[in-house]
UniProtKB/Swiss-Prot annotation, chains B, D:
Keyword set includes Nuclease: no
Keyword Heme assigned: no
Function: The glycine cleavage system catalyzes the degradation of glycine. The P protein binds the alpha-amino group of glycine through its pyridoxal phosphate cofactor; CO(2) is released and the remaining methylamine moiety is then transferred to the lipoamide cofactor of the H protein.
Gene: gcvPA
HAMAP family referenced in this protein's UniProt entry, alphabetically: GcvPA
Domain of life: Archaea
Record organism: Thermoplasma volcanium (strain ATCC 51530 / DSM 4299 / JCM 9571 / NBRC 15438 / GSS1)
Catalytic activity, reaction form: N(6)-[(R)-lipoyl]-L-lysyl-[glycine-cleavage complex H protein] + glycine + H(+) = N(6)-[(R)-S(8)-aminomethyldihydrolipoyl]-L-lysyl-[glycine-cleavage complex H protein] + CO2
UniProt enzyme class: oxidoreductase
Single GO BP term: nucleoside metabolic process
Protein name as catalogued: Probable glycine dehydrogenase (decarboxylating) subunit 1
């Protein structure tokens, strides 16, 4: 069905506050002329959004194998934790002795993230993965400012997430792109050539967006560090290596986490996320303030970091997301987290093998938690196949990313999907190849709406009713 | 055979260990060190124990950015629906119309509330949205100076500084007068050819409702007017679109989002239509599908990082979609009459609070109308003593603006929930403490 | 889509309790041979039920005007109240001093129900409306046993809910049916003729299932009381008369409430409900035990009712439903409850007037919260029209009840639906008349399944997989 | 014009008062007397205040019908979905397949767990289900006597009596032996030609697992065997279908339903296929739709009150649909291995509890294996003293069975949550009290 916009629903407002108040309390010159919000009943609002909810795909309805997005099942106990009144109804300016439980959770989470990543200090403040990147970039900037070095370039692989170059630019750096080699890994020669005294940092994801582990990571670290630059870890794919290796062991200096990806907090239809940043000890003083300290007796907010970049957001980060990640981590423990990665990688390689007879799956064959196939060899367009997948009641992969693979489909099954799910997904992807181009282009047709005119959307630009 | 064994078989391997053979032994991790898995019910037990160490049943007079307001339970119901909560960015619009339409409605509702042309589909919080607004101003006019009020909190300034650091923009504070309002002369004297934007706040960092902001568009010259407002106050106050704002920014937490110890929040950004291509973040547009049926879709993605990479207008990827849903459903449930009531009650309660404190000799710093936050003259730091009596409140202005000249300034905040009984409890407690 | 049954879903069990235990703790002779529950992941279970949920109509998706069922919007704050840990996690055998809050709520609810109904004492114990009826019948039985009178008959109008005769029979009474008169009210002459020394009670709903207020209720009470019998009020339709009149004022001796109907607690897909019973003071001692008393200081469970019928269920009733009803009542207060009835009756009469040109709406014209139309004059079958309604994304009325109206459709809009909803509903009902019989019989076709073979269901009787 | 005015206009009336003109003035009500409406947030405030007066953070050793067990949060999630929660009895099956299928699965899961042919779609609670079972037995064989164990709690007996009162059936208690198990000889001597059913419990009212129940089908003659069981125990214990039960009854609260101060509960009733047409309540059957597609529907409705009225097999209308959903999702999440683990841990913890109390001289009444509830010899009533120490437990048997000969009998209950730390706290507390 077509759901009207809320403005077009007619009923009577049922919201009420019983206390009376006289409008004259405010002088006329301060007042607005008119206000045109909907005046509908709570029931109509609830119905409206309930109907809209049924026009929205969710991981609770089916698998959601968007590469790099890590759409795993978000366990319900973590939602329950974040809904506890004692966590929801506290104000950030409450005296520390009235929020010891909240600070305890944050402190523990800092510690856990340190152990998982083998880094030395953590700030929970960044509000999303990209915000973590920006924070990391600011740390890089401040670090070299402090050292009195004028370094203006950030190097980034051509397979990197778009947020990496965008974050680097926001920090005022120039972006230098290095190509991948024929294994889909960073081309070491190109990297050596790109590195200079102007290099502030190298940003990299490992495993990378092709789902391939950068086996030369130690060599990369050496190249970067020898140049006096910093090595930055984009944590979007951290879920592939829990307990196996870590950014700290690989030689990274700065790491951001995507708690919503790695630690299964709900993605909320596109946020809120949480993007904590971890650093090696020599960078601890640059972290945003406050961080949470423990004096053996009580927890406190420490604002006294000598070279802090200051603040990147209002308070202490996405607390309700931090809570869920904390819950997820203690629920899993060492063994659970290791199993998460093992199963994620198993699922990825299993699905990859089922598809490799039909689709070109370029570069190094052993994948981690995700892999990228190309539809180029099939003569079909990735977009069309993606739309056909939707018609089967499941979500399509990320398409046309990473940019270095033509007609790319980036598939991350995650560890929570079953073999039956993977078999079914493979069947659908294989079935798609039997359809005519015309048929594929007519898809989807079982969805709430069919293909949307994106050109019109951008041209007519209707952004409000 | 269980599913793992049969998958291993299919891959021709004995264990999942083999799938990690590409990871050099020299970087292998021994153990994580978090410990054994904890049963689900024990996780909840621990969480409840920790939560019980937070005091939530106290009388709340805290504000200055985060407010304890009435949230209709229906808002919680809506944002808890897993069809929204556990979905992702609507990259496949055909199966994401629910989220897309709800964000489109959020954009529309905020635009109407602010009387601005367009609203983006969210920033992280008010502070970072202000940072993005400054960057956007730079993209629009290429000028370097941002003027901000002296009442800007240090933390907000710090975020703003970080956002414009990469652009080497200069931030300069202008003065406020003795009523706690913009010193028009001082501001005017600072606006020059290099001024990219003037930032005004209403209510401002002193909590004061400032009619001088309505006059800034007349004096701002070539610069842009960035208005930072309280969205609840717009239930009665003149909205930024009515006084010539180019970009309007707000912290949206008050629109149906629990305090949550200060996060996640919702950065609201509205702007004039002309600037849309310079705007950061995500936009949802209306279009039609192959059958000509109305449909919503992410639009102007060419400004975004996943397409434009280093040249994107921002690095925003995950933003605050779920919280736009909270704000949209909150505004829809309250409606014009509800929001107006909430705003008026807030002003009434602030007035009651000031009168009651006045009766025991605690005076306001400024003889102006406050919205939620009122600044009182109290030399002593009363916060911890009040907390012992079950009352939260008494933020020192100097804890927000370190070098403020109003060193005795102490905030107490009212909302629509601050009834006379609560005010009386505060008065009684202050009488004992002072 | 077709959702498989849970048994056919294949994955791996993810439930875990970490403590180890040896099977040998139990001797072999006590053990079961095998156990064949599903072994699937929590994710698969969540997905399964999420998908099923989307194949289920709810009042949160659209209006649900089932006559006598009172499917109004259930406000979300009441769900929140019942979810508070301090209410959910208490055991019925906890010492009274550890459950004072729960007892306070129950006490208040008893008091509110007394005020609303003008009765003198309340038991919250019955678990549903029909259970309340059964409880009332047991009180009748015990009352006459105590008086030493042998009364064996319960009189019931022909328009009554099916639960009335069924409950009477469960109590061992014979059921005597009295017809309705041409206004759709109890035929007083027939009632006088039916009443005798064998009459134990007369059970009646007012307004009745035709949505018509029994204007002779005082005369009815006189007839029944003069015969030494008791007058029983079926509270299913109480929502029509809040603050206008009450069973107590009308002369009733025993009343049951349907909290889930009158006070907007969720119906749960067919329960749990809550069916408290209220009585006049002379019957208080017959109530089930315990009731909640207040001594001015603390609340206690009073088991000391002299002539109590004992217990009708395990503990103190459907506590989580009681909580919601309590919330709803204090939220509304006097004014709110009066408005509930006023709007419910307005909606009903408005819709009735919109339809009366098209459908026969028999009996007395002024309706209360619901009305009954007949499709007989249209030549269409009520069942077929009902199925057509479903195709419009809204729920059909109760059909073929009450039995005294041929091709009956019993419509109760409730107070939470808007004028726009009613206009739309009327349009659909009028539109239906334009369709051919054949077309109507082919409906529904936009639903998850189409018309179901009920004969096969009863004949093949597949009640488990 | 607002919607009410325009509806009044359409009806040609001035106010809604006129719609009540049919109500005699002599029965008009003046006021209700509940007071003014309370704002939603104040309702929640009051509810939270009252809830805080209930003690929930205590160590729980209470049981005897209601148990504090692990409930996967996913179960709460599922039953909170408004698509289920706010729907009605599936009278229109085409738009109610979700609820219908879930109930069909519940019927199937319980039938498998109990090893019985069929299961109905719920009764109110275990006690009333036992009452319905007795009435069903009467409908099947027309006999008048019900035999029940001496260990039947008074409240259960009271409910049973009320259910069979209208049938004038006779209830007779049979004896238990010194092990707290069925005295077979005594029972056998009571079974005669007028015996409609023998009720057995396993575990029984003394908490004892009783293998004698497995032998009753051999001696019951023409009567029916009604088994009242603990559904969790069936994770390991022999199920009623394996020892010839005709009807099996249970209280289903333990299957994913919070304690909720004892309600709502879930009455489980399973039976042999032959008796289906005599069974009370609702049944969901599988069939096909007009396109031949599998579909579920309420079936054998001709037994029900809305069709059969005075001749119905029960008066059940609203039953416990939502709680069948809880039970179905609970069993699906736990699976065979999970349920077995829960059952075994329960037995293990009961054993640990008995050993620990034994160590401080508190002996079991019966030298038998307990499931959850273990009866100890303690003369003193320790319940209130324990509560002061934050421990719930110590129900006296005589508070459940007034005239029981085991006057010192005192219950302590274990579940899968009763770990050694909790047992130690109980032991320490008891040492001080006794």
């Amino acid at each position: 069905y077509e759901e009207p916009i809320i403005k077009d629903i007619k009923s009577s407002n049922t919201f009420s506050l019983s206390e009376q108040v006289d409008e004259s309390i405010l002088p006329e010159n301060l007042k607005r002329k008119d206000l045109e919000l909907p005046e509908v009943s709570e029931y109509d609002v609830v119905r409206h959004y309930t109907r809209l909810s049924q026009m929205n795909y969710t991981v609770d309805v089916g698998i959601y194998p968007l590469g790099s997005c890590t759409m795993k099942y978000n366990p319900k106990f973590a939602d329950r934790v974040s809904a506890i009144d004692g966590f929801r109804n506290i104000h950030p300016f409450q005296p520390e002795n009235t929020v010891q439980g909240a600070l305890h959770v944050m402190y523990d989470l800092q510690e856990y993230l340190k152990k998982i990543s083998d880094m030395d200090a953590v700030s929970l403040q960044p509000m999303a993965g990209a915000d973590g990147e920006f924070t990391g970039i600011l740390i890089v900037k401040k670090y070299f400012e402090d050292k009195g070095e004028d370094r203006t370039e950030i190097i980034i692989p051509d397979s990197a997430h778009g947020t990496n170059p965008a974050s680097a630019t926001m920090g005022g750096f120039d972006v230098v792109e290095v190509p991948s080699d024929d294994k889909g890994m960073v081309d070491l020669e190109a990297l050596r050539a790109a590195v200079s005294k102007k290099t502030a940092a190298f940003m990299i994801t490992n495993p990378n967006t092709l789902g391939i582990f950068e086996q030369n990571i130690e060599e990369i670290a050496k190249i970067i560090h020898n140049a006096g630059a910093l090595l930055y870890y984009d944590g979007a794919n951290l879920n592939a290596i829990f307990g196996i290796t870590s950014p700290g062991l690989m030689g990274f200096d700065i790491v951001h986490f995507n708690l919503h990806k790695s630690f299964a907090t709900p993605h909320g239809g596109g946020g809120p996320g949480a993007g904590p940043v971890a650093v090696k000890s020599f960078l601890k003083d640059f972290l945003p303030v406050p961080i949470v300290d423990f004096d053996g007796n009580s927890y406190r907010l420490n604002y006294e970091l000598k070279k802090t970049i200051g603040k990147v957001s209002s308070f202490y980060g996405s607390f309700s997301i931090l809570l869920r990640a904390w819950s997820y981590i203690i629920r899993n423990g060492d063994d659970g987290l290791k199993n998460v990665s093992a199963r994620a990688v198993l699922n990825s390689n299993y699905l990859k093998k089922k598809l490799e007879k039909y689709y070109d799956i370029p570069y190094y064959p052993l994948k981690k938690h995700e892999f990228v196939l190309s539809t180029e060899n099939t003569g079909k367009r990735a977009l069309d196949i993606g739309k056909y997948i939707l018609d089967n009641g499941i979500h399509s992969p990320t398409v046309y990313f990473p940019l270095i693979v033509k007609e790319a489909m980036m598939i991350e099954p995650t560890e929570t999907v079953s073999k039956a799910d993977l078999d079914n997904y493979a069947d659908v992807l294989i079935e798609a190849l039997k359809l005519s181009d015309e048929e594929l282009k007519s898809r989807p047709k079982n969805t709430a709406v069919r293909r949307i005119d994106e050109v019109k959307a951008a041209r007519d630009l209707k952004l409000k009713w | 055979m269980d599913e793992i064994s049969s998958m291993l078989d299919y891959l021709g391997i004995k264990s999942t260990e083999e799938l990690f053979s590409d990871i050099p032994l020299s970087v292998r991790k021994k153990e994580i060190g978090i410990g054994s898995p904890l049963d689900e019910h024990l996780v909840l037990e621990r969480a409840r124990k920790y939560a019980s160490l937070n005091s939530t049943e106290m009388l709340n007079f805290l504000g200055n950015g985060i407010y304890d307001r009435v949230i209709p339970e229906a808002v919680n119901y809506i944002i808890s629906k897993s069809e929204f909560l556990d979905s992702y960015t609507p990259y496949q619009p055909e199966v994401s119309q629910g989220m897309l339409q709800s964000i489109f409605e959020y954009q529309s509702l905020i635009s109407d509330l602010f009387k601005m042309d367009f609203t983006n589909a969210s920033m992280y919080d008010g502070y970072s949205a202000l940072g993005e607004a400054a960057r956007m101003a730079y993209r629009i006019n290429g000028k370097n100076k941002i003027l901000i009020p002296e009442s800007t909190y240090d933390s907000k300034l710090s975020v703003l500084k970080n956002y414009v650091w990469g652009l080497s923009m200069k931030i300069e504070k202008y003065k406020m007068n003795e009523e706690g309002k913009i010193d028009i002369d001082d501001l005017q004297s600072r606006i020059d050819g290099d001024t990219s934007a003037v930032v005004v706040e209403n209510p401002n960092g002193y909590g004061v409702i400032d009619e001088n902001v309505f006059r800034i568009s007349e004096i701002k010259k070539e610069s842009l007017l960035i208005s930072y407002v309280d969205p609840i106050s717009l239930g009665v106050l003149k909205p930024p679109g009515e006084y010539g704002s180019d970009i309007a920014i707000a912290e949206g937490q008050q629109l149906g989002i629990p305090m949550n110890f200060g996060g996640p929040l919702l950065g609201i950004m509205s702007f004039k239509a002309d600037y849309v291509r310079k705007s950061p973040g995500r936009l949802i547009g209306e279009s039609v599908d192959a059958d000509g049926k109305r449909a919503f879709v992410m639009t102007l993605q060419t400004r975004e990082q996943h397409i434009r990479r280093a040249k994107a207008t921002s690095n925003i990827c995950s933003n605050q979609a779920l919280l736009t849903l909270a704000a949209g459903s909150y505004l829809s449930i309250l409606g014009s009459s509800g929001l107006k009531k909430v705003a008026l009650l807030t002003i009434k309660h602030s007035k009651n609070l000031a009168e009651s404190l006045g009766n025991i000799g605690i005076e306001k710093v400024f003889d102006s109308i406050s919205f939620s936050d009122t600044l009182f003259r109290i030399d002593k730091n009363v916060m911890l003593d009040l907390a012992k009596k079950g009352i939260l409140g008494g933020i020192k202005l100097t804890s927000l603006i370190k070098d403020s000249k109003y060193s005795s300034g102490t905030f107490f905040t009212a909302t629509e929930k601050t009834d006379n009984e609560k005010i009386k409890a505060l008065v009684n407690a202050l009488e004992v403490i002072m």
